[in-house]
Amino acid sequence: MLAPVCAVLAAGLLGVAEAAPAPCVNQEIVLEAKPLEMDYRNNNAVLRDVVITQCGVRIQADEARITGGLDFENSHWTISGDVRITAEGGSLSSDKAIVAFRNKLISAATITGAPAQFEQQREDGTTARGHANTIEYQTTSGTVSFNNNAWLSYGRNEITGQQLVYNIRSQSVQGMTKPGAARGDGRVRIVIQPDKPPQITTPGQEKEKKP
């Protein structure tokens, strides 16, 4: 299990009030795609121009290779080519991802790329952006885990580390590390840029600006 190495940052830095979404129970999955190969004996398939939607989650990619069947009961889809996943105001993009389905629900997505990218428009008007070698998105918890060379920014501030976990509902971030990691491997670096001081002009300067 992952162990936290620093507490969730103060609400004034990153957090806002968390709004829990309605539970995704018995919600239909809508699949749009062009079938290329259908192997009914081995329960595998290859699809093109794939779009999957459920409970506000939208997944699209150029291609999907499916193991475990099209019933979404317990299957894994390897999607590739212009991968884009949108959910709860956030978006993930990469060249490749593995999407897991459990009990006819979109359960999780593991996104890999060079690097995998994340973006969310925050409630305070700033945009959170992040990237890492691997990003894991969990639909039930609303968490986005950045693994290996993780970087996250919001406004003019940024956080870096080997592992970061961002909650897209509470819009808060937590640094994480693995048990047994070498000392210093779990450190996070937070850079907070100061606000720019207001520009002060004298009455004489104002007059000079007038024609």
Q: Language-model segments: what does each one mean?
A:
Residues M1-P211:
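Mature-chain termini and adjacent capping regions
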